[in-house]
């Protein structure tokens, strides 16, 4: 057996190289032609049924508006019912023929089952499932007194998507529908203080890439990896080391630094266009894909940069991080941060 592996270790690299040299040019040409056809034949969602989790704010809210503009029927869920009703009213005004709202916690399997059942019972079908609900963190791993305090991140970000997808699959098969998965560029970036959040987003990518193989062409899956987009997370809403939701905009300044924060409306528009084309994946803003290339080619450089920018010496306040000093010294916040994320009015429920 060891001899076989030794042989494969020698043969596999050159064989793979020559195979790719022959395969990639026609493959890329075919993909280009398919992308043109997909753009020309984008799905029409008028009258179709879309369920969006985490729809009370941020990307989920604006995805509801984009679907509404295209005439889709909406089922919106989140923990904040009052905010959901406000989103629903706007969606109706924008053109959605029917909108229902459901208060739910996607970390609970029974809530996820109820969400899908109520959607199908009301509309009679389900065409798109948008798994968007998420919470973030911004604390060093060793500074968390009880690591179990961070369980809600994985339970919401990962298991919440797992539960809703499992209960929705049979209905999506019938409609040959689509799943939109909200991962993050943090799924590949080694960002300090976002360890469990990054793990939850990376787990989503692995799960849905595997699920794509299992379901084949019956259900389309679009994996979205947003960068910094205006949302409650970029407003500074994090799960604290004590397991409580808190708002800390100084810490947000450390984490985001002088990186431009994208428009949530533009992000949502890009996501829905990508979904209707049937794209496999989308990174928005697209320039964040270069960070993945850097990670592949020189991971040590990426890790060193993150350590230099975001970490401070032991006993030194987090606000002394180089990332925040750069932000403050350049005045980049006024240029790169939308007014919406500089508002102190952020709900923590």
UniProtKB/Swiss-Prot annotation:
The regions listed as transmembrane in this protein's record are 10-30
Q: Which residues bind substrate?
A: 184
Keyword annotations for this protein, in alphabetical order, are: Lipid droplet, Membrane, NADP, Oxidoreductase, Signal-anchor, Transmembrane, Transmembrane helix
Bilayer topology reads:
Single-pass type II membrane protein
- One Pfam family name from the record? adh_short
Q: Which parts of the sequence bind NADP(+)?
A: 54-80, 105, 132-135, 197-201
Q: Where are the active-site residues found? A: 197 (proton acceptor)
Principal place of residence: other
List the subcellular locations. Answer: Lipid droplet; Membrane
Keyword Oxidoreductase on this protein?
A: yes
Q: Which GO terms describe its molecular function?
A: 11-beta-hydroxysteroid dehydrogenase (NADP+) activity; 17-beta-hydroxysteroid dehydrogenase (NADP+) activity
Domain note: The proline-knob motif may be involved in the targeting to oil bodies.
Q: What does this protein do?
A: Has dehydrogenase activity against 11 beta-hydroxysteroid and 17 beta-hydroxysteroid. May be involved in signal transduction regulated by various sterols.
Q: What is this protein called?
A: 11-beta-hydroxysteroid dehydrogenase A
Which organism's genome codes for this protein? Arachis hypogaea (Peanut)
């Amino acid at each position: 057996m060891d001899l076989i592996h030794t042989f494969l270790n020698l043969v596999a690299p050159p064989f793979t190289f020559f195979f790719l040299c022959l395969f990639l040019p026609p493959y890329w040409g075919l993909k280009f032609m398919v992308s043109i056809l997909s753009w020309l034949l984008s799905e029409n969602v008028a009258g179709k049924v879309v369920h969006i989790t985490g729809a009370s704010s941020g990307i989920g809210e604006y995805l509801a508006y984009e679907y509404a503009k295209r005439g889709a029927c909406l089922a919106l869920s989140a923990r904040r019912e009052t905010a959901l009703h406000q989103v629903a009213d706007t969606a109706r005004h924008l053109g959605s023929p029917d909108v229902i709202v459901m208060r739910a916690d996607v970390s609970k399997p029974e809530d996820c089952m109820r969400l899908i059942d109520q959607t199908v019972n009301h509309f009679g079908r389900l065409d798109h499932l948008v798994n968007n609900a998420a919470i973030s963190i911004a604390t060093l791993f060793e500074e968390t007194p009880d690591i179990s305090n961070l369980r809600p991140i994985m339970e919401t970000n990962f298991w919440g998507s797992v539960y809703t997808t499992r209960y929705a699959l049979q209905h999506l098969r019938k409609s040959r529908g689509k799943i939109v998965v909200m991962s993050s560029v943090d799924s590949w970036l080694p960002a300090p203080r976002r360890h469990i959040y990054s793990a939850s987003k990376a787990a989503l990518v692995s799960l849905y890439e595997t699920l794509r193989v299992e379901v084949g062409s019956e259900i389309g899956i679009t994996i979205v990896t947003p960068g910094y987009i205006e949302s409650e997370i970029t407003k500074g809403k994090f799960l604290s080391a004590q397991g409580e939701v808190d708002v800390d905009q100084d810490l947000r300044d450390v984490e985001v630094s002088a990186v431009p924060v994208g428009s949530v409306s533009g992000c949502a528009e890009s996501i829905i266009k990508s979904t209707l084309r049937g794209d496999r994946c989308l990174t928005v803003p697209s320039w964040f894909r270069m960070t993945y290339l850097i990670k592949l080619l020189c991971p040590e450089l990426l890790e060193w940069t993150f350590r230099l920018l975001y970490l401070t010496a032991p006993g030194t306040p987090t606000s002394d991080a180089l990332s925040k000093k750069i932000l403050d010294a350049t005045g980049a916040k006024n240029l790169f941060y939308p007014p919406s994320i500089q508002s102190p009015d952020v709900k923590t429920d």
